[in-house]
């Protein structure tokens, strides 16, 4: 009997519109070599029978910046949420609020750093229970808005020093299921902001696009808050120091 192990499932979305990107549009490299994951409806890419250990999946698509994600293959199936960011040839240039963020450390460019940017989405999503304890893998949530929250999707629980990044894998009624247990406790009414992962280039710069003027939280790899930015219409240029 032939057994196939699903090593990783990657869901790919357009980071500007939130729409699904079908796998047939993507060019994929795994650990530097071209690969062809199995594309499934709904923007899913399926990687099977990978050697145990760390891997890097790179994704390219016309109109978008190159994106990559690192994960470790093992006995369990890894669930990955990837957003492709608009590039120079992206079609909706006039509708964008642009951010160019320069990141420095010790006066030098902070190259190759992973940062999360989180901003309010079309739907307001908040914790709806008195307290969500650290170690809990589910949350009672309150959603308000015309559009359904992105599920599965990555979010920042905006909670000051207790802020953290989570992956919301399912939402049934008011109950949200998390990919991993909470690292920190959170109280009622803490907001869940849609979050996207970015990588600084060799000059310590990243570029992002948003649908409207907004407040953006800049976070480190684990969701620790580094800066808050207010974006206005048109081009926005900011510098932060780690």
Predicted stretch roles:
Residues 9-13, 98-104, 142-144:
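Short edge beta-strand/loop segments characteristic of extracellular beta-sandwich folds
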Residues 19-22, 29-49, 124-126, 130, ...:
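Short, acidic Ser/Thr/Gly-rich low-complexity loop/linker segments typical of extracellular
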Residues 44, 48-73, 215-236:
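A short, solvent-exposed loop/turn motif at the edges and junctions
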Residues 44-49, 142-143, 179, 203-210, ...:
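Exposed aromatic-hydrophobic patches
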């Amino acid at each position: 009997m032939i057994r196939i192990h699903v090593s990783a499932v990657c869901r790919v979305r357009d980071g500007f519109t939130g729409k699904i990107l079908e796998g047939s549009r993507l060019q994929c490299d795994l650990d530097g070599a071209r690969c062809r994951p199995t594309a499934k409806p709904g923007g899913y890419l399926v990687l099977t029978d990978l050697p145990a250990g760390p891997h890097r999946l790179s994704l390219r698509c016309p109109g978008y910046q190159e994106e990559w994600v690192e994960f470790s293959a093992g006995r369990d199936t890894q669930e990955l949420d990837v957003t492709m960011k608009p590039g120079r040839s992206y079609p909706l240039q006039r509708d964008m609020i642009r951010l160019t963020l320069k990141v420095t450390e010790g006066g030098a460019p902070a190259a190759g750093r992973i940062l999360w940017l989180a901003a309010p989405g079309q739907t307001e999503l908040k914790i709806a229970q008195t307290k969500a304890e650290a170690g809990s893998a589910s949350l009672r949530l309150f959603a308000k808005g015309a559009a359904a929250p992105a599920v599965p999707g990555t979010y920042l629980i905006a909670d000051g020093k207790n802020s953290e990044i989570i992956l919301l894998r399912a939402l049934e009624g008011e109950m949200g299921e998390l990919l991993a247990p909470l690292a920190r406790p959170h109280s009622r009414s803490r907001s869940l902001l849609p979050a996207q992962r970015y990588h600084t280039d060799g000059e310590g710069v990243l570029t992002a696009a948003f649908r409207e003027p907004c407040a953006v939280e800049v976070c480190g790899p684990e969701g620790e808050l580094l800066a808050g930015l207010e974006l206005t219409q048109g081009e926005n240029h900011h510098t932060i120091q780690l």
